[in-house]
Amino acid sequence: MSGDFPTAARAAEILERVRQMRPRVHCLMNTVVQKFTADGITVIGGIPSMTTSLEEIESFVTKADALTVNLGTLDAERRRVIRLAIEIANASGKPWIVDPVHVDYSPSRLDFARELIAQSPTIVRGNRAEMSLIGDVPDVVRIETGPVDHLRDRTRNVSIVNGHPWMAKVTGTGCLSGGVIAAFMAVEKDALTAAASALAVTGVSAELAAQRAKGPGTFEPAFLDALSEISGEDIINHARIEHEQG
């Protein structure tokens, strides 16, 4: 991993690369938020796909540039698809992120998350309760989300101090952010920088959206508008990326 710390200028540059390169992101996503996540990836510049068909997953992951795996809705068939998708991503060297949603609610889900994390994801992302159960994961970028997002790898600790409280009142903003992280990973090999940049972009977009929204109901479409319209200047002027040596 690179030893450089992410910056607002770097985030703006990576966003421009996403818009120019239009990476394909395959999403094994919580069914509740599939459309919102797909919309977020699309407006930021990526191309999402969402199939969970066991017969199709190999083809879709092979054609994707990155994979995002969310454990929000699980059943036996979904577990088989996730295992195969990760096997294909690893075999082809594609970056992937796993979000161990609600592992604090279900021991079997926690066991499954640990099984997946043993397959060496690029990034593991969850809230404080989830990540406290996951623990340290060597050689993986670890993201703990909250009002301030904390990221770390072996040598760097970074915090993203952007966002808005309405993000917590709209179902799926975190899942959408995971999709945006995957799009950024597809064009930036430094996974911590990619993730920090993606979270800065989504956080600044949320702040800009809140300026024109009246509440959570109008915030959701305003957030998508802001993601679509955010400029490099917006990121440089408003991103708050804090870091210290690990």
From Swiss-Prot:
SUPFAM superfamilies (UniProt xref): Ribokinase-like
Metabolic or biological pathway, per its Swiss-Prot or TrEMBL entry: Cofactor biosynthesis; thiamine diphosphate biosynthesis; 4-methyl-5-(2-phosphoethyl)-thiazole from 5-(2-hydroxyethyl)-4-methylthiazole: step 1/1
Residues involved in ATP binding: R125, T145
Reaction equation(s) it catalyzes: 5-(2-hydroxyethyl)-4-methylthiazole + ATP = 4-methyl-5-(2-phosphooxyethyl)-thiazole + ADP + H(+)
Binding-site residues for substrate, renumbered to this chain: M50, G172
Entry keywords, A to Z: ATP-binding, Kinase, Magnesium, Metal-binding, Nucleotide-binding, Thiamine biosynthesis, Transferase
Cofactors named for this entry: Mg(2+)
Pfam families in alphabetical order: HK
Alphabetized InterPro entries for the sequence: Hyethyz_kinase, Ribokinase-like
Keyword Nucleotide-binding tagged: yes
Entry GO MF terms: ATP binding; hydroxyethylthiazole kinase activity; magnesium ion binding
Family classification: Belongs to the Thz kinase family.
Protein name: Probable hydroxyethylthiazole kinase
Source organism: Agrobacterium fabrum (strain C58 / ATCC 33970) (Agrobacterium tumefaciens (strain C58))
